[in-house]
């Protein structure tokens, strides 16, 4: 049979994702910060979109004076009565009158226009920047568009770098040494450890290794003790040296921290050359040291998480679910501007496209809010016991259950719960927190939430251990089974490792050591 090429016609139907549909999907999974940035970009591109003004007036409610050129007097502006009333109003306001007179005097004295030297506009501001009260708290005008709230700095602590910069002049009088020290300060991580190589630093700064080591030795005497260490052992050694407790036995202990992590106390006693009582005293001193000397300082401006949904108890005993108005985007379509400008046929096509895009955006934002409300309301209905009684009553829940209840697709529910937060009487939770896998119950009972088992029952069993009765993974399985929870041993081991809980052998060594320390 010979092979040949032929042409065929076929009709078919398929779904095509339009740009508008892709945009609605993207908006659904955005956080409110990302959404505000996106809307600000759209307002900048689309002349029909605008933010509402603070007094509640926007768009077509600005009045007929919008068509008049700025600074053009109106018809009644030339009347004597209107001029007298305005003059009387100005003269009655001491602040405005005094300000205008002061401005005139400055213009004469500076031989320049005051507004050119000190403009009223402090620089470029975000389109959604707060006004009125917010202007007294914010610091706009950054070239990068940064917008900080002064409330973030009121209760803020001194940063680690600022704290060290205040001490450097007292230990390093030489300016060259101070420059090297500042380079070291810039290389610190949030825990206060130095993340750089001394040889590389010396070559980069064009100085000798001896001078670099001299500067580092001086910096390691600063407060907090242990700062500028390059390892945990060096951090502990610096703190012990400042306490005058860095003797040969303690040096051997610090040099073998891996044995301490394994609770191999027999080997540590032999290496340190001490008996059990002295070793316990040394371990007590180690526990009093700070492994993260820079942890008590602010790393930067704190960023508060704003909830997208707020849940409150209602008067009828249920729950009132509301969208947070502070996170809802506010954007309007200026229909009156479209009607006035489209009288010119040349602009009609462009503005019609802008109007279509603006209407689609507003409908998408409205649909996004309704979808978040539906998903949040169903989550609250499913997790009613958790809101009333706590994490021990958290029910197992998956995306499919919520999607079927609200008649939406699982992917839609997944996008809604991504990076969205709910404020409840129990605290602030991400929406994904309420979705946990189920754990089978013994003899076909009610299933349990994996998060509830980990957070309450599993941890409670570990905390109730005694030095002479440490539970192994098999023991935990048996005790959970008595409580109606069916878990495999490998699942218990996985939960234990995820919660950073040591094995039964290591826990037994640690509890016995702590008991001996408490006994002395």
Curated annotation (Swiss-Prot):
Region (Disordered): 49-107
Keywords, comma-separated and alphabetical: DNA-binding, DNA-directed RNA polymerase, Nitrogen fixation, Nucleotidyltransferase, Sigma factor, Transcription, Transcription regulation, Transferase
Motif (RPON box): 488-496
GO MF annotation list: DNA binding; DNA-binding transcription activator activity; nucleotidyltransferase activity; sigma factor activity
Keyword Disulfide bond annotated: no
GO CC terms: DNA-directed RNA polymerase complex
Domain of life: Bacteria
GO biological process entries: DNA-templated transcription initiation; nitrogen fixation
Short name of any one Pfam family annotated for the protein: Sigma54_DBD
Chain residues forming the annotated DNA-binding region: 398-417
InterPro entries in the record: RNA_pol_sigma_54, RNA_pol_sigma_54_core-bd, RNA_pol_sigma_54_DNA-bd, RpoN_core-bd_sf
NCBIfam families xrefs: PRK05932.1-3, PRK12469.1, rpoN_sigma
Function recorded in the entry: Sigma factors are initiation factors that promote the attachment of RNA polymerase to specific initiation sites and are then released. This sigma factor is responsible for the expression of the nitrogen fixation genes (nif operon), GlnA and DctA for dicarboxylate transport. The open complex (sigma-54 and core RNA polymerase) serves as the receptor for receipt of the melting signal from the remotely bound activator proteins NifA, NtrC, or DctD for the expression of the regulated proteins.
Family affiliation: Belongs to the sigma-54 factor family.
Annotated protein name in UniProt: RNA polymerase sigma-54 factor
Organism, scientific name: Rhizobium etli
């Amino acid at each position: 049979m010979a092979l040949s090429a032929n042409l065929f016609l076929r009709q078919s139907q398929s779904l095509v994702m339009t740009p508008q549909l892709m945009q609605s999907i993207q908006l659904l999974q955005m956080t409110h910060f990302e959404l505000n940035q996106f809307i600000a970009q759209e307002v900048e591109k689309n002349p029909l979109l605008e933010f509402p003004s603070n007094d509640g007036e926007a768009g077509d409610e600005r009045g007929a004076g919008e068509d008049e050129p700025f600074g053009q007097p109106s018809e009644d502006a030339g009347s004597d009565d209107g001029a007298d009333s305005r003059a009387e109003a100005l003269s009655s306001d001491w602040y405005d009158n005094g300000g205008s007179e002061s401005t005139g005097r400055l213009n004469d004295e500076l031989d320049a226009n005051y507004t050119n030297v000190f403009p009223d506009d402090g620089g470029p501001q975000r389109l959604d920047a707060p006004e009125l009260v917010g202007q007294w708290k914010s610091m706009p005008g950054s070239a990068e568009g940064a917008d900080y709230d002064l409330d973030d700095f009121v209760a803020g602590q001194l940063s680690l770098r600022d704290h060290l910069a205040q001490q450097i002049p007292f230990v390093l009088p030489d300016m060259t040494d101070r420059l090297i020290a500042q380079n070291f300060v810039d290389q610190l991580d949030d825990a206060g450890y130095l993340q750089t190589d001394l040889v590389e630093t010396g070559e980069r700064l064009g100085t000798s290794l001896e001078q670099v080591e001299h500067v580092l030795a001086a910096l390691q005497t600063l407060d907090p003790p242990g700062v500028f260490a390059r390892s945990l052992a060096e951090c502990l050694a610096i703190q012990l040296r400042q306490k005058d407790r860095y003797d040969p036995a303690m040096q051997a202990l610090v040099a073998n921290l891996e044995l301490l992590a394994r609770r191999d106390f027999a080997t540590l006693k032999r290496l340190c050359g001490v008996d059990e009582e002295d070793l316990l005293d040394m371990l007590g001193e180690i526990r009093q040291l700070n492994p993260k000397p820079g942890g008590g300082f602010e790393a930067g401006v704190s960023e508060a998480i704003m909830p997208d949904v707020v849940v409150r108890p209602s008067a009828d005993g249920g729950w009132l679910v509301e969208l947070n108005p502070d996170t809802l985007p506010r954007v309007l379509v200026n229909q009156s501007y479209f009607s006035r400008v489209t009288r010119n046929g040349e602009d009609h096509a462009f503005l019609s496209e802008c109007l279509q895009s603006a209407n689609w955006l507003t409908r998408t934002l409205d649909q996004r809010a309704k979808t978040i409300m539906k998903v949040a309301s169903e989550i609250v209905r499913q997790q009613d016991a958790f809101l009333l009684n706590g994490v021990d009553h958290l029910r197992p829940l998956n995306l499919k259950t919520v999607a079927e209840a609200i008649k939406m697709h699982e992917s839609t529910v997944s996008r809604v719960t991504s990076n969205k937060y709910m404020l409840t009487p129990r605290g602030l939770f991400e929406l994904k927190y309420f979705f946990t896998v189920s754990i089978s119950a013994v003899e076909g009972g009610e299933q349990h939430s994996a998060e509830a088992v980990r957070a309450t029952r599993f941890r409670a069993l570990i905390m109730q251990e005694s030095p002479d009765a440490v539970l192994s993974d098999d023991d935990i399985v048996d005790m959970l089974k008595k409580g109606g929870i069916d878990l495999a041993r490998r699942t218990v081991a996985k939960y234990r490792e995820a919660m950073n809980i040591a094995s039964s052998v290591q826990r037994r060594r640690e509890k016995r050591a702590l008991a001996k320390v408490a006994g002395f």
